[in-house]
A protein has these predicted regions:
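Juxtamembrane proline-rich low-complexity "stalk" or linker regions positioned immediately after a signal peptide
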Residues: 1-4, 8
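Active-site beta->alpha N-cap acidic-glycine motif
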Residues: 9-86
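Active-site mouth loops of central-metabolism enzymes
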Residues: 20-27, 86-96, 175-181
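Short, contiguous strand/loop micro-motifs
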Residues: 21, 46-47, 89, 120-121, ...
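Glycine-rich anion/phosphate-binding loops
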Residues: 52-58, 92-100
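Catalytic domains of cell-wall/extracellular-matrix polysaccharide-remodeling enzymes
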Residues: 95-186
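Catalytic grooves of carbohydrate-active enzymes
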Residues: 192-193
């Protein structure tokens, strides 16, 4: 079966009278203490691990054994000067180099459902590059979750055009470091669901 985004997903037994919320925790893998706390949370949760984090196989095996779903958090070029991290997909790269970086990232650990962008506001707003990325992921059976780091992202439009599994986040829960703000955004998330 080629649809890894289905094969590697955690089954959820839905009752039709309820709405459901998917929570994705990204930037995983760099802080061992946070990782050990997060994997003990109830769930299942979807944990997205940075492609350049250390000990990825060990960390993702632990997360998976605790019942959590896995994603690959792939660095992509942002607007501005911030460094997205090692192995980032950059807008001035040719398809061959993009493909090499993508292949290296996809081999970091097994059993994930797809990728989401780490940063990437410049990359995800480029139609040609997103067509290349989304078609490459579709061929390999992975989904793309757009972190929506820019309102100019073309990911959803490209996913529809290519009949590829592409989804976008609705709300960032913690882009403001405040418990009060996170609770407010959780309430907004419930309203959307």
């Amino acid at each position: 079966h080629l649809a890894k985004w289905i094969d590697n997903s955690i089954p959820v037994f839905k009752q039709p009278e309820f709405s459901y919320i998917a929570i994705v925790l990204d930037d995983m893998g760099l802080n061992k203490k946070i990782m050990s706390e997060v994997v003990e949370l109830g769930g299942p949760l979807t944990l997205s691990f940075l492609s350049y984090a250390p000990n990825l196989i060990e960390q993702t095996t632990i997360a998976s054994s605790k019942g959590h779903e896995l994603m690959l958090h792939l660095p992509m070029e942002p607007l501005g000067d911030e460094d997205p991290g090692p192995g980032a997909l950059l807008v001035d790269m040719k398809n061959m180099e993009l493909n090499q970086r993508l292949n290296l990232a996809l081999e970091k650990f097994p059993n994930f459902i797809g990728i989401n962008n780490h940063m990437g506001s410049r990359f995800t707003s480029n139609s040609k590059l997103m067509e290349f990325l989304i078609s490459s992921l579709k061929k390999r059976g992975y989904l793309f979750l757009d972190s929506v780091t820019t309102s100019r992202s073309v990911a959803l439009k490209m996913g529809r055009r290519l009949s590829a599994p592409v989804v976008a986040r609705d709300i960032f829960l913690d882009d403001v470091d405040s418990e009060k703000e996170v609770k407010l955004r959780l309430a907004q998330t419930e309203l959307i669901a």
